[in-house]
């Protein structure tokens, strides 16, 4: 069976009855139509279906229109009442999964409906249309479409509903397939027992059994799909053979760790059955010309329709780029001084968690850039949690010409030497905590208390750090990979937000027990498994991590937590990244929180009083995604004066979802979901067939538009290699994905990930912004290396006016790249607030380059951000590309944070300008 998929019968038992009049009240298709309409309606409103109303509408429109058209042209009957087309369309809306947008939604319904007229014997279709549509989409879409995941159904309680529904429908329709169902269930149980025994050393048997027999997908396949009378056996012996054949082929496919196994098994059976029917009716084809003529006519007509659609798609999706004018040249560690070697962190975790430590500790290799010593060059702090003791949590000072030297931070020695008791440093953010003119360092912690280091450069004249006192709100226990800062109340002091990615305290205990992957509690009674209840309880709506923390800056290095009941936050999502900036141009910093295993969260700042959660009504709208949000980055990609939002996601087998690109069309002060529209697919920034992580915005070729760099790849075997070719863990993950929370929510039910890979060798992307679309030019730009990347930093390390890059990796040393670009005009600005009405870092200040000075002919809009993006803080300075316009002074306007005072400046291009607020 396809792990994680929903093989729902798309065409019901009597779907091919051609009604030329309105159906009767006792038409058996009507209850099926009602049932599927209920599935779809609940799915896009309450459950976790990743289909928008527009996508569902398009699928239905194609099924109905094409069915009526082909019926009229090929069978020359009265106009068809398209009940079957509606049912097929609704079923495909349940079955298929793809990114937001409309073009992909057209593929399955076209092939599903066409198969009813092309592949026939004696005028009857041999393939279940929905099955054919799904198989065609899987084979032809190059991974852009997958069957919908089982977790879209929302939870274990729905399983009983589907079992009861299936039984009632079967009884009501009396389709005489009880032998088929009984034999299939028996054979599949035996097959599953065999697989569970063979795989017992890789995955707990309970996981396989409960994954299959508690999945709505399995019962939908059993009670609906294989019982379709036109495409299933009628005799008892035939039904026994059909059940055995499907289960046997399914077993063979699992031998090769295949996906979509039941789909392919059923398709193989229907193909053989169709050939058998042709053989049985061979006497009718002694003169094959009429049948061949009808087949050719159907094939030609459907080919003409499909070809027209394909041509229209290609015409509107012709993405191309001019010659790439820059190249990323990698700087070796021997020159840069920045490196990282393998550590022993996985082996130091609790022995009961070592089989999943690689999964749970797959995030946290972060980089943060700022000028720590005020010498004008960007310095780098690297967390490197999985690296050796001497490489973890190190500050590298920029000495020019891409040479860096380590600066000692003895305050962090306990974290380097004793992560079991002090935790792993997993995120970092530079900011001027006390508005004294130097950069302090906020450190997010995995399984430990947060740290805040005050920079004493301004006070002593020498770079050095001291710990901000214990008892501060920053000192709370954390499991965090996301920290950021913002002046949420515009008081001139930067506040802190900390995103927790897991539950900090173990549930089920009558006392507070911190969750520490290095040391779990011992069992207190027979069968005590509470310590393993640490995994996500849903694959699309997990709410069992922990609350995110908003800390108000009280001045003097003191921070106080604002309770979520007061700040407007809600839920306990698995937060991976937090982006902050003014999304609706009201002068206050808003928040976008990217969450794994569930919907992201958009919070609009209500004038510094609290945050308003914004959520759309249907899938495809902001706050209603079922994705695996990894990254959140703000920036104005279309220069309309509003920051857009880029969210990295997964686009792989089982999860054809991809990145979100929320284009901002808001009006000033707007606070509803209509502010944003996801245009990742339309703008060719989906990051298809990649496991996305961090991303950053910057004008790489200095043409006046913000480009996107994207980190990819989940887990390789660089630190735990066991076999010459790394086995794929995604297959085992798919078995786990079928299960209910009482299985996949417990770590001891997970398969062993050691020595296995999860999309571990993937190329990063460089998306050039061409105005209305993006083009990936990574290979032309010199990014040919494949691996697993996390944080993506853009910074001008050599101050030459183009953006260099630093990429972090969980199981490899950081990659440092110099941008070697052709000459082009540019101007850079570093803003400094007055520290009273506007914070010294000038976060939230907005800079506009006049349209007459921009090579695009449109004004360039930028905002000063702190730390937008997963595991990476980029250069805070703003760099404007001027293209060929770089000879005379350029005009910039600055709207300062806080009161919003505006100043205009005339600046000389080709250099950075430090602008201090009056």
Positions of predicted regions on the chain:
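Repeat-based blade/solenoid architectures
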Residues: 338-366, 411-429, 471-484, 544, ...
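Membrane-interface helix-loop-helix junctions at boundaries between adjacent transmembrane segments
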Residues: 77-155
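Beta-propeller blade repeat segments, especially FG-GAP/WD-type strand-to-loop junctions
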Residues: 325-328, 390-408, 449-468, 508-518, ...
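Hydrophobic beta-strand segments that make up the repeating blades of beta-propeller
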Residues: 379-384, 440-445, 496-500, 586, ...
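Internal/C-terminal transmembrane anchor helices
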Residues: 290-315
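Beta-propeller blade termini
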Residues: 364-374, 397, 424-435, 454, ...
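N-terminal signal-anchor module of multipass membrane proteins
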Residues: 10-71
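Gly/Ser/Thr/Pro-enriched helix-cap/hinge segments flanking short amphipathic alpha-helices
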Residues: 307-325, 336-337, 345-357, 363, ...
């Amino acid at each position: 069976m396809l792990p994680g998929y929903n093989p729902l019968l798309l065409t019901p038992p009597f779907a091919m009855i051609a009604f030329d009049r309105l159906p009767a009240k006792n038409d058996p298709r009507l209850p099926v139509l009602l049932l599927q309409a209920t599935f779809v309606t609940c799915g896009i409103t309450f459950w976790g279906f990743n289909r928008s109303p527009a996508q569902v509408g398009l699928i239905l429109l194609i099924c109905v229109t094409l069915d009526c058209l082909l019926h009229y042209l090929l069978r020359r009957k009265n106009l068809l009442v398209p009940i079957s087309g509606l049912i097929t369309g609704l079923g495909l809306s349940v079955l298929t999964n793809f990114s937001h947008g409309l073009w992909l939604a057209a593929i399955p319904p076209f092939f599903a409906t066409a198969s009813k007229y092309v592949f026939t014997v004696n005028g009857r279709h041999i393939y279940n249309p929905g099955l054919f549509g799904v198989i065609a989409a899987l084979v032809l879409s190059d991974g852009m479409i997958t069957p919908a995941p089982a977790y879209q159904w929302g939870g274990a309680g729905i399983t009983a509903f589907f079992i009861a529904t299936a039984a009632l429908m079967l009884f009501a329709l009396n389709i005489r397939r009880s032998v088929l169902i009984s034999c299939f269930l028996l054979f599949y149980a035996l097959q599953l027992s065999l697989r569970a025994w063979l795989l017992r050393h890789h995955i707990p048997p309970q996981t396989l059994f409960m994954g299959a027999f508690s999945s709505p997908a399995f019962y939908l396949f059993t009670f609906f799909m294989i019982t379709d009378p036109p495409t299933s056996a009628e005799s008892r012996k035939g039904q026994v053979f059909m059940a055995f054949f499907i289960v046997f082929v399914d077993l063979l496919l699992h031998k090769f760790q295949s996906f979509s196994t039941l789909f392919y098994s059923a398709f193989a059976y229907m193909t053989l059955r169709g050939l058998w029917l042709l053989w049985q009716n061979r006497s009718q084809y002694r003169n094959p010309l009429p049948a061949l003529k009808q087949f050719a006519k159907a094939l030609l007509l459907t080919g003409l329709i499909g070809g027209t659609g394909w041509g229209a798609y290609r015409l509107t999706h012709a993405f191309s780029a001019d010659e790439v004018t820059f190249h990323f040249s990698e700087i070796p560690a021997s020159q840069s001084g920045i490196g990282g070697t393998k550590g022993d962190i996985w082996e130091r975790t609790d022995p009961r968690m070592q089989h999943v430590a690689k999964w749970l500790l797959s995030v946290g290799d972060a980089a943060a850039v700022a000028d720590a010593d005020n010498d004008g060059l960007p310095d780098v702090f690297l967390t490197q949690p999985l690296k050796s003791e001497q490489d973890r949590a190190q500050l590298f000072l920029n000495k020019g010409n891409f040479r860096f030297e380590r600066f000692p931070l003895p305050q962090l020695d306990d974290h380097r030497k004793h992560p079991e008791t002090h935790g792993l440093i997993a995120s970092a953010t530079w900011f001027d905590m006390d508005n004294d003119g130097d950069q302090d360092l906020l450190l997010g912690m995995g399984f430990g208390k947060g740290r805040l280091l005050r920079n004493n450069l301004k006070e002593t004249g020498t770079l050095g750090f001291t710990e901000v006192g214990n008892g501060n709100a920053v000192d709370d226990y954390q499991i965090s990979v996301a920290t950021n800062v913002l002046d949420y109340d515009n008081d001139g002091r930067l506040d802190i937000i900390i995103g927790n990615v897991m539950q900090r305290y173990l549930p089920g205990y009558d006392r507070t027990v911190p969750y520490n992957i290095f040391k779990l509690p011992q069992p207190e009674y027979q069968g005590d498994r509470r310590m393993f209840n640490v995994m996500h309880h849903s694959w699309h709506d997990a709410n069992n991590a922990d609350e995110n923390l908003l800390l108000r800056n009280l001045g003097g290095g003191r921070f106080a937590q604002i309770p979520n009941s007061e700040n407007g936050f809600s839920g306990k999502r698995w937060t991976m990244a937090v982006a902050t900036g003014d999304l609706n141009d009201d002068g206050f910093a808003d928040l976008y929180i990217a969450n794994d295993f569930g919907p992201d969260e958009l919070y609009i700042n209500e004038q510094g009083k609290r945050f308003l959660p914004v959520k759309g009504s249907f899938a495809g709208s902001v706050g209603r995604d079922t994705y695996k949000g990894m990254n959140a980055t703000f920036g104005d990609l279309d220069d309309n004066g509003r920051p857009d939002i880029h969210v990295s996601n997964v686009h792989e087998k089982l999860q054809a979802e991809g990145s979100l690109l929320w284009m901002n069309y808001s009006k000033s002060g707007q606070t509803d979901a209509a502010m944003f529209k996801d245009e990742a697919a339309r703008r060719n920034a989906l990051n298809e067939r990649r496991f996305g992580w961090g991303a950053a915005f910057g004008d790489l070729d200095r043409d006046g538009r913000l480009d996107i760099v994207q980190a990819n790849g989940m887990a390789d075997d660089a630190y735990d290699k066991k076999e010459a070719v790394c086995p794929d863990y995604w297959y085992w993950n798919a078995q786990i994905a079928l299960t209910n929370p009482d299985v996949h929510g417990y770590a001891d039910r997970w398969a062993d990930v050691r020595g296995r890979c999860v999309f571990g060798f993937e190329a990063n992307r460089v998306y050039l912004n061409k105005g209305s679309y993006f083009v990936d030019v990574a290979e032309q730009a010199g990014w040919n290396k494949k691996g697993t990347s996390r944080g993506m930093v853009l910074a001008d390390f050599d101050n030459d006016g183009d953006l260099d890059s630093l990429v972090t990796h969980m199981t490899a040393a950081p990659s440092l790249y110099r941008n070697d670009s052709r000459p082009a005009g540019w101007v850079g600005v570093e803003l400094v607030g007055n520290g009273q009405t506007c914070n010294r870092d000038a976060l939230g200040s907005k800079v506009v380059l006049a349209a007459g000075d921009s090579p695009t002919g449109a004004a360039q809009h930028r905002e000063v951000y702190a730390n937008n993006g997963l595991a990476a803080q980029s250069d805070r300075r703003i760099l404007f590309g001027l293209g060929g316009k770089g000879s005379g002074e350029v005009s910039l306007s600055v709207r300062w944070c806080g009161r919003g005072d505006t100043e205009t400046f005339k600046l000389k291009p080709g250099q950075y300008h430090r602008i201090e607020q009056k």
